[in-house]
Amino acid sequence: MDGNYTLVTEFILLGFPTRPELQIVLFLVFLTLYGIILTGNIGLMMLIRTDPHLQTPMYFFLSNLSFADLCFSSAIVPKMLVNFLSENKSISLYGCALQFYFSCAFADTESFILAAMAYDRYVAICNPLLYTVVMSRGICVWLIVLSYIGGNMSSLVHTSFAFILKYCDKNVINHFFCDLPPLLKLSCTDTSVNEWLLSTYGSSVEIFCFIVIVISYYFILRSVLRIRSSSGRKKTFSTCASHLTSVAIYQGTLLFIYSRPTYLYTPNTDKIISVFYTIIIPVLNPLIYSLRNKDVKDAAKRAVRLKVDSS
């Protein structure tokens, strides 16, 4: 690299380059989706916190999953909404670092929480007599603390290595937020270490969580198949239905990100995938756990009745 370069102090987020009238339409669509994310996840957290019937480890984990979803989207969507209405789509170097750090931290935290939820279901179904001992309040809190520590440590590694790089002259990020792959393309220094970290350390977090989930469900399935009555098998496995659906959507998306062939790495493909896991999944999770869970539906009905009776 020669000495004739200018260090970048801010980036331009290209976002979704379309006609101005379509920008307004996209703004309204994503604003509506973000409103659903806020309402759904905050509503679910409040319901779990206030309803005495939902004070179990499973719902404690679910409440933290909703919090991680909410924070993950909130690290990205507000800036994206502002950029739809503004001609100035810039973000400072430090702002970009913060956005990337928090989005990466909460994404990885969510993976760890989903793994903890799978372990919780394993203990509940395979060792029901020891459930209250194994999944005590203290253990549950530690699992959540470790999930947040794991997510933040992973993010700290990626953020530190990404922002010690020099960015010269080119400053247009072909994305709607500061994500690592499009950011690395702008660096004027060697990014081989970052690319190695992304493909090994980054994927190892998801692979570890995926392995925990697969092993947990292997033992769950073995226990369920030992139940003689079909109604008993169905009732037992139904307690995992919401979690399995959530895992299939989230981990399926991440597995596609890490396993897709190189010819599928295009900016537009990345944007579509990013919209799915930053916005669509946080919209779907509260719906999945509300519509497919009898306890949550009953708690919602009790909350509505209480509100009606008190008014």
UniProtKB/Swiss-Prot annotation:
InterPro entries associated with the record: GPCR_Rhodpsn, GPCR_Rhodpsn_7TM, Olfact_rcpt
Stored SUPFAM superfamilies: Family A G protein-coupled receptor-like
Keyword field: Cell membrane, G-protein coupled receptor, Glycoprotein, Membrane, Olfaction, Receptor, Sensory transduction, Transducer, Transmembrane, Transmembrane helix
Transmembrane helix among keywords: yes
A Pfam family annotated for this UniProt entry: 7tm_4
Name used for this protein in its record: Olfactory receptor-like protein OLF1
Molecular function GO labels: G protein-coupled receptor activity; odorant binding; olfactory receptor activity
Location within or outside the cell: Cell membrane
